[in-house]
Amino acid sequence: MKKLFVLGAGLLQVPVIKKAREMGYYVIAADDDPNAPGMALVDKAIVPRGLVDEERVLAIAKEERIDGVIHPCSEVAMNVLGRINDELHLSGISKETAIRATNKHLMREAFERYGAPSPKSILTKNGEDAWNIFCQEFDTNAILKPSRNSGSRGIAKVEKGMPKETFDILYRRALEESRDHQVLIEQFIEGPEFSVEVIVWKGNPYVLAVTDKKTTEAPYFVELGHNQPSVYPTEIQHRLKDGAIAGCKALGLNNCAAHCELKIQNGKAYLMEIGARMGGDFISTELTHLSSGIDMVAAAINVALGIAPNLQPTEPKHGACIRYFCPKPGKLISIEGTGMLNQAFVYDAEIYCQPGDCIPAKNS
């Protein structure tokens, strides 16, 4: 029986843990929280007391004699995953690739070398440097982005004519969210946002789905919903797919899932970033199999174990979407209307708050 090592056992990792058990694999999970929901579902649960500690987690992988490692829907321990693959000669990305795929500056450099479609991007030295670059080298609005972070945390739009004091506040926020304390300033692409869900096997990227995204407005662009399949014209979808494939090749991805984020401006696709893992927000774990009929979770598990994935539809195809309902900031008084969640068109629903909780502002 093959052993799969899952880094993380939170809500977003639970579908992967369940699927791997269903597929007959022995599943080991490591999470610093012993009460993480996936810890009770695995064959063996380990609390490493430092999931990002390469030496500690590598020692666990060696001791358990694992056959593959996966870090679904998260980037926190991607370097650890790459190191394990290198040391144990396993399927999946190398540490070098993991570093490139989790550092947005190195990612932009890789896109530029390969010719993958990418907006103008400059690594800043500090807040004053960023302001000068914005004033002197950008004739359009721009984006401040943490060099190392996943999701939308720390990302903010900066607009021409805004006060320097406001710019400085947004810069400091991006800096605080960056794990390497570096911030990029990038050309702002005016247009709709998408993601492309991909499985890379033996160096070849295979597109499974194109996702239409719904976000909040500037400055933070927090993701509030996702729709599959895309309703955009076929020509636009082809450009998105081509951009995603070029980006995966530019990063040197191999034997992994990929979540590729792009925008369209004036008919042209631009890569925002690529994660060398399944997408969060239940895009890869739920939406993709509902819309495409392809079991992306099973495919990602198999490529991590060095097994050829089944990329043919095995289920009926549906239109599917997910929405995150975010009340205004403040104290939550009551939750009403939950009866609608029992309707036939609702595949799944979760409520993460309860009356009395404090609802924060939507900025990440």
Residue ranges: model-predicted function:
Residues 86-154:
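A conserved helix-loop-beta module that forms one wall/lid of the active-site cleft
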Residues 60-66, 136-139, 179:
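Glycine-rich phosphate-binding loop signature in dinucleotide/nucleotide-binding domains
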Residues 2-3, 141, 184:
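Residues that mark the start of a beta-strand
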Residues 1-97, 128, 309-310, 353-364:
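ATP-binding N-terminal substructure of ATP-dependent carboxylate-amine bond-forming enzymes
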Residues 155-269, 278:
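Internal nucleotide-binding/catalytic subdomain
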Residues 113, 130, 299-364:
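Peripheral (often C-terminal) accessory segments that flank ATP-dependent C-N-forming ligase machineries
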Residues 239-260, 265-266, 275-333:
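Active-site "cap" helix and flanking loop/linker of ATP-utilizing ligase/carboxylase catalytic domains
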